[in-house]
């Protein structure tokens, strides 16, 4: 099941981004200095007690020079469209404003659960002023302070009470779930239809015509699949035309439910910045990844074109160096038959478990080939390694000092593991841990 989504909505200057940052904390910080991985502050993962969720800050939408109330309306529409629960943010210092009432009218019609938050209640003396907010029609207002972090626990408790009940998906463990993600009109739905051999998903040359994520069970050569097709961005309202940020929302929710993620590119148009952003989310998820170049039939080419395009992909997506690249045409169905075997291969790699003795032989051979680094006269010592997880393969390496594990040496060890065990299409995680 995808994680529930909370949207924070409200007029400007009520502190939406401050509350967003308070809730997500360090989870939005960039931990890898790799080109192409952009953590978008408008959307992030959050956690409260035993609840995991995704959260949207609608204040991050760049509307441009639109009139004030139009901006508010567009932000509210995004929240209504995407969220399971909406936190309606107001400002306790200003009281109820006409703009708050405008937001309330829109949200009241949404029939989504609304939790009313009154921000900037920074001291107990201000609590008596929040009762005016009952007039907005959303029940008890929750006083909070983004500056001091006060009241967020009660607010999140109330939001979590409205999360959809989690239901187990009716697919067995042998079923491979894969999603197709990419910007609008790269041919995701056409590719689904090419695989299925039928017009199962509505397809149009208008970008964003797939209405939502669609699950399609599918079997081929005794292997069961579930295809999760996502719209890149719905054609609904000017807000979707004016920002690309929300194109990742459905992709992210589909990624959470996938074993394998297909990042679909438009071979005719080439690579743009939004492709890199979406691919970065695929990498960050830890899922197996395949890069699919669609519309290859429309590309003027010679014997060098494919190699040049592949080199361009590798240059732009350095963080996906492990992902195989498949060139095809959903329209003509050329090379589409090559896709499922690659999906099977990367899914298998994603689940590889290596015996501890074999793993340690490979690690020690790597150390003999390329001695561990030193820093300030101290040398990194590797004692032993063990695999602690699959999907993705995750290894703990016990060392004398974790600070001595330089990222370049970690990358060297990852490359040696790939050479030894394959790991096609899957990221590898290495955790350095000091031995007690």
Curated annotation (Swiss-Prot):
Residues that hold GTP 1 according to the record: 10-17, 57-61, 119-122
Entry superkingdom: Bacteria
Keywords for the protein's UniProt record, in alphabetical order: GTP-binding, Nucleotide-binding, Repeat, Ribosome biogenesis
Every EngA-type G domain range: 4-167, 176-351
GO annotation, biological process: ribosome biogenesis
Domain KH-like: 352-436
Residues annotated as binding GTP 2: 182-189, 229-233, 294-297
Pfam families assigned: KH_dom-like (PF14714), MMR_HSR1 (PF01926)
Recorded GO MF terms: GTP binding; ribosome binding
UniProt cross-references to Gene3D superfamilies, sorted A to Z: 3.30.300.20, P-loop containing nucleotide triphosphate hydrolases
Keyword presence, Repeat: yes
Task performed by this protein: GTPase that plays an essential role in the late steps of ribosome biogenesis.
Assembly notes: Associates with the 50S ribosomal subunit.
NCBIfam families referenced in this protein's UniProt entry, alphabetically: GTPase_EngA, small_GTP
UniProt family annotation: Belongs to the TRAFAC class TrmE-Era-EngA-EngB-Septin-like GTPase superfamily. EngA (Der) GTPase family.
Name of the featured protein: GTPase Der
Gene name in the database record: der
């Amino acid at each position: 099941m995808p994680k529930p989504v909370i949207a924070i909505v409200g007029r400007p200057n009520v502190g939406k981004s401050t509350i967003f940052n308070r809730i997500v904390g360090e989870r939005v910080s960039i931990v890898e200095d790799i080109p192409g991985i952009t953590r978008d502050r408008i959307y992030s993962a959050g956690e409260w007690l035993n609840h995991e969720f995704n959260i949207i800050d609608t204040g991050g939408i760049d509307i441009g020079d639109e009139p004030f109330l139009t901006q508010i309306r567009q932000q509210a529409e995004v929240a209504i469209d995407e969220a399971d629960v909406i936190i309606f943010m107001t400002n306790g210092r200003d009281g109820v404003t006409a703009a708050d009432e405008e937001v309330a009218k829109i949200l009241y019609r949404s029939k989504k659960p609304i939790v009313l938050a009154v921000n900037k209640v920074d001291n107990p003396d201000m609590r008596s002023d929040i009762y005016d907010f009952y007039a907005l029609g959303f029940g008890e207002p929750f006083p909070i302070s983004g500056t001091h972090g006060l009241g967020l626990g009660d607010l999140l408790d109330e939001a979590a009470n409205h999360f959809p009940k989690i239901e187990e998906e009716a697919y067995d463990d042998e079923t491979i779930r894969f999603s197709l993600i990419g910007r609008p009109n790269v041919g995701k739905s056409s590719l689904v239809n090419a695989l299925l051999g039928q017009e199962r998903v509505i397809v149009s040359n208008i970008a964003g015509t797939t209405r939502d994520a669609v699950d399609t069970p599918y079997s081929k050569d005794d292997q069961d699949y579930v295809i999760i097709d996502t719209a890149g961005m719905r054609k609904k309202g000017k807000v979707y035309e004016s920002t690309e940020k929300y194109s990742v929302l459905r992709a992210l929710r589909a990624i959470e439910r996938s074993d394998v993620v297909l990042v679909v590119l438009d071979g005719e148009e080439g690579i743009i910045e939004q492709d890199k952003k979406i691919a970065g989310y695929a990498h960050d998820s830890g899922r197996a990844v395949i890069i699919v170049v669609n519309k290859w039939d429309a590309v003027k080419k010679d014997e060098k074109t494919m190699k040049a395009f592949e080199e361009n992909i590798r240059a732009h997506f350095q963080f996906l160096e492990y992902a195989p690249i498949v060139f095809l045409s959903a329209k003509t169905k050329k090379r589409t038959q090559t896709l499922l075997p690659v999906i099977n291969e990367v899914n298998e790699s994603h689940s590889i478990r290596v015996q501890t003795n074999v793993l340690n032989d490979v690690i020690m051979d790597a150390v003999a080939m390329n001695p561990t680094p030193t820093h300030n006269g101290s040398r990194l010592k590797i004692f032993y390694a063990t695999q602690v997880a699959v999907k993705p393969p995750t290894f703990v390496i016990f060392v004398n000092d974790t600070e001595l594990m330089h990222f370049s040496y970690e990358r060297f060890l990852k490359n040696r593991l790939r050479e030894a065990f394959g790991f096609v299409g899957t990221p590898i995680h290495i955790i350095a841990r000091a031995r007690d």
